[in-house]
Amino acid sequence: MTFDLTFDNRFTRDLPADTEPRNFTRQVHQAGFSRVKPTPVSAPKWVAGSKEVAELIGLDPKWLGSAELTEVLAGNALADGMDPFAMCYGGHQFGNWAGQLGDGRAINLGEVVTADEKHWTLQLKGAGLTPYSRTADGLAVLRSSVREFLCSEAMHHLGVPTTRALSLVLTGEKVLRDMFYDGHPEHELGAIVCRVAPSFIRFGNFEIFASREDTETLQTLVEHTIRSEFSHLLSEPDAEIGPDVIAAMFEEVCRTTAEMVVHWMRVGFVHGVMNTDNMSILGLTIDYGPYGWLEDYDPDWTPNTTDAQGRRYRYAHQPQIAQWNLVALANALVPLVKEAEPLQRGIAVYVEEFQKSWHSMMAGKLGLSKYESETDDELVDSLLTLLQLAETDMTIFYRRLADIELGTREQPVTLELAAVLRHLSEAHYVADEVTEEYQQALMDWMRSYQSRVLADDGFPAEDSQRRQRMNAVNPKYVLRNYLAQLAIDACDKGDDSLVSELLEVLRRPYDDQPGKERFAEKRPEWARHRPGCSMLSCSS
């Protein structure tokens, strides 16, 4: 069966393969991958699919939900042209070198090439044991799979660079998991997500070969990556790939990584586990594990229970961690570039690009035509302080800020506390925290904000135009942690309608969508400390 898909499996063609054909956990040397087939499951059941992703890879959406496609995306069958494999890579986890990691439960089916000659790798997450599974079982549960499926698509529609998700399928089998590693394992429903990306190559793919001083395989991987994903850096297709080209690739990775993290900060996304094996060479958000969304603005928040003490991967620290990870990648490339200076330039590009993109992003969130450091550094700093004085929902605050009438230079509106609070009260979690001191700080900031907006040379003449500009970058709908948990709870009981409804709402996160307002509500009190809503683990 072909589904009218054409496969061109460049990775398995270009990289050396593991010479051991048997599938058992082991150290794999001098190989970019191991060939391994998905483990068949007993009773696959279609839960949800993305029509946009199907069209992206050239798959007729009519196949979504069909028995034939369900069998393939559950790992029970292979379409013609597929060449399944698991990647070998390493990584730094929480700042420490972890050695070989690899695709422990992800199996790549192959690379689809579309009519416009774009390549898309299809990958099943939770498809069974591989040589890289270590002590795990290679499986995934419904809980984590619903979260990955929904967030992959939500992030894309938010405008955040990300891998995509084609499908979510139940396996019909139970999987034993200890959700919080507290000695109380339970059986959960098994599931598989089909992830889609131009490439799933990570920083850790390069690190593993550098750590083993396997320069030959490292060079092969770099050449494959540049010819496949960075061919625009070559003067001609078969041009030699030397240190200059490798340094140019690294510089581009630094730039796209900066852009990705700025988008995370814009929408309040916290990845939760920014290890180098979870960093895409293409600057895509990858591996949706214990991620979370800032609800009340807390720059020190991390959703990952494993990181609860050190908070290495907290929201505000993500830009610095991305830079740390890029340095780790640079160290892996030094054996090929021969010197550090060209790679140090890439790190400088990251710092510069992040700062520039951050300023542009904050200007957009506030409806300004451009960022002026002389005035806006203080305006933004005081805003971020204000958001912490009272527990304030970040998403709702920016959205409702756009609704406050400021007037024009000729006729500025006189800001009144009651009117401002009427707009912003929806964003406050605890009414008692809206003290007189807070109200004074709020009004001081609002007047500074109004003055800055009305002095903006590029400012639209009408409040409605400012509102339109702000609402284009400040989403109304994000995948709030409690919404994902409600979808999981329903799906666990056999009702997948909320997954489909959420997917539909999250396709238009910047639109008002009358009738869907319940999906824009701030976190309810019952979800404040509930597992899955406030904190998550790496158990999946």
From Swiss-Prot:
ATP binds at residues 102, 104-105, 125, 137-138, 195, 202, 287. Its EC number is 2.7.7.-, 2.7.7.108. Mg(2+) binds at residues 278, 287. It holds the Pfam family SelO. The active site is at 277 (proton acceptor). InterPro entries: SelO. It catalyses: L-seryl-[protein] + ATP = 3-O-(5'-adenylyl)-L-seryl-[protein] + diphosphate; L-threonyl-[protein] + ATP = 3-O-(5'-adenylyl)-L-threonyl-[protein] + diphosphate; L-tyrosyl-[protein] + ATP = O-(5'-adenylyl)-L-tyrosyl-[protein] + diphosphate; L-histidyl-[protein] + UTP = N(tele)-(5'-uridylyl)-L-histidyl-[protein] + diphosphate. Its cofactor is Mg(2+); Mn(2+). Signal peptide: none annotated. GO terms for molecular function: AMPylase activity; ATP binding; magnesium ion binding. Keywords: ATP-binding, Magnesium, Manganese, Metal-binding, Nucleotide-binding, Nucleotidyltransferase, Transferase. Belongs to the SELO family. NCBIfam families: PRK00029.1 (NF000658). Nucleotidyltransferase involved in the post-translational modification of proteins. It can catalyze the addition of adenosine monophosphate (AMP) or uridine monophosphate (UMP) to a protein, resulting in modifications known as AMPylation and UMPylation. This is Protein nucleotidyltransferase YdiU. The gene is ydiU.
